[in-house]
């Protein structure tokens, strides 16, 4: 039975094994300790079903035999319910897209947010529309329209349900805030103002501290704990990344939060950070923008097209670099990457923070900090008193929860590129997904050991879900179900 232990999330009489009701599961921590998936699943082994899905990066949300996902086409946002046993579409609804956006990053998508449900109401969120609440059969309960945040990298946080409330990260909007709505009516209960915060992809995280129900939200160099009752700020920690994608997680009185962003590196370090370790970019091209053009400007027209760019973070953010939006990158747009630009306020770091206290608890409660092997997007995983991190390039790190002492650091998985999906724990194993489509089964231990690897041959942005010892993975074009 789901109970309020460290978190006060979704109260229900459903067993934890039969639901994965929101981003990162029943307790929003990405763990399914009593389940076990096949160790040898692949595209042609232990595959129960595979169905096509619309475009979208949201993760599957599951309540017993129903799966909820979102997606979109050029005209409409879509929210869909599937039969978990067969993949059959049970119902599908849509809302109009008022404006087609071109994002600065290839990972930008108008349907990033994972649905959330308590078994009676399902919450869908689209930043360019608002909040939509239905019952499990798709009947509309209410809507709450919001002004779009309109981030050039899209919106990436997910709505969270806790104690009959819905919490939504609104950082960077005209109403920059943490928004709390009544789950049953959609009416605003409170809004904690967060002025001067830039957009972040951090999902709110419910946590119980003594007799207080808190909501943790990170962004713009801070992690703030708010009262879930009235939005009052209880405590905060500073010295974190200015732009953050991971979400916090807590276990045994320790909150783990932080990440990595290019905003906090410059010059040679910044250039090297935007290329994959296995790329064909020469060492000379990493030091000199002219050499880079000489290497990749195939038609020698003094400009680089998207096709000419090597696979890299730079290619993923081509629209961001192409400031005049003419479809090409010229030297004046590329060369600034190589300069020692001032770093944005904040720093790349992962912190272990003791819960408790009030006000600024940075000096009093930060137990440890980690500066290597930091994730850009994937949230930290706490399992069996160890913290696991999955970083760009296919590097895994494992540290002790209470001390931050490394058990292993930056161990290679063997597949480079980005790691957008957050790692999850299932029984004695971890599941880690590479953006390139590889899915790793790793031993949940103090030593890095890869048990199995399969390749879905499609890009992966979404975090997997596990229910009844079956794993559900959303790739670029399909949703997959694996199990016995």
Language model segments and positions:
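Noncatalytic, solvent-exposed loop/strand surfaces
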Residues: 13-484
């Amino acid at each position: 039975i789901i109970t309020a232990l460290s978190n006060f999330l979704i109260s229900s009489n459903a067993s934890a094994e039969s639901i994965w009701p929101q981003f990162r599961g029943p307790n929003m921590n990405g763990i399914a300790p009593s389940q076990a998936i096949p160790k040898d699943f692949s595209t042609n082994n232990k595959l129960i079903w595979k169905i096509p899905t619309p475009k979208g990066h949201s993760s599957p949300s599951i309540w017993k035999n129903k799966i909820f996902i979102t997606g979109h086409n050029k005209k409409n946002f879509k929210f869909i319910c599937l039969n978990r046993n067969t993949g059959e579409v049970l119902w599908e609804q849509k809302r109009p897209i008022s404006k087609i956006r071109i994002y600065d990053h290839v990972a930008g998508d108008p349907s990033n947010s994972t649905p959330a449900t308590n078994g009676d109401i399902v919450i869908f969120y689209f930043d360019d529309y608002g909040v939509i609440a239905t019952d499990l059969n798709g009947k509309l309960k209410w809507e709450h329209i919001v002004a779009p945040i309109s981030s050039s990298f899209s919106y990436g946080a997910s709505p969270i349900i806790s104690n009959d409330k819905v919490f939504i990260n609104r950082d960077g909007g005209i109403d920059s805030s943490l928004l709390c709505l009544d789950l049953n009516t959609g009416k605003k209960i409170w809004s904690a103002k967060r002025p001067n915060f830039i957009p972040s992809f951090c999902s709110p995280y419910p946590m119980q501290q003594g007799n207080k129900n808190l909501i943790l939200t990170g962004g713009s160099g801070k992690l703030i704990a708010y009262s879930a009752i009235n939005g009052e700020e209880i405590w905060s920690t500073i010295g974190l990344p200015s732009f953050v994608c991971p979400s916090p997680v807590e276990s045994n009185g320790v909150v783990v939060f932080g990440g990595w962003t290019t905003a906090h590196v410059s010059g040679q370090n910044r250039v090297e950070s935007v290329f994959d370790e296995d790329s064909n970019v020469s060492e000379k091209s990493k030091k000199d923008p002219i050499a880079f053009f000489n290497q990749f400007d195939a038609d020698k027209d003094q400009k680089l097209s998207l096709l000419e760019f090597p696979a890299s973070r730079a290619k993923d953010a081509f629209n961001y670099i192409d400031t005049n939006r003419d479809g090409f990158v010229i030297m004046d747009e590329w060369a600034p990457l190589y300069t020692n630009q001032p770093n944005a306020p904040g720093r790349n770091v992962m912190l272990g923070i003791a819960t408790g206290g009030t006000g600024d608890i940075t000096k009093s409660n930060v137990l440890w900090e980690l500066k290597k092997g930091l994730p850009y997007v994937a949230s930290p995983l706490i399992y069996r008193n160890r913290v696991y991190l999955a970083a760009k390039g296919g590097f895994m790190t494992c540290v002790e929860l209470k001390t931050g002492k490394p058990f292993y650091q930056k161990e290679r998985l063997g597949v480079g590129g980005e790691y957008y999906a957050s790692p999850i724990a299932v029984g004695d194993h971890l599941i880690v997904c590479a953006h390139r489509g590889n899915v790793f089964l790793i031993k949940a231990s103090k030593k890095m050991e890869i048990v199995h690897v399969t390749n879905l041959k499609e890009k992966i942005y979404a975090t997997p879900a596990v229910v009844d010892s079956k794993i559900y993975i959303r790739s670029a074009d399909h949703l997959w179900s694996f199990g016995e």
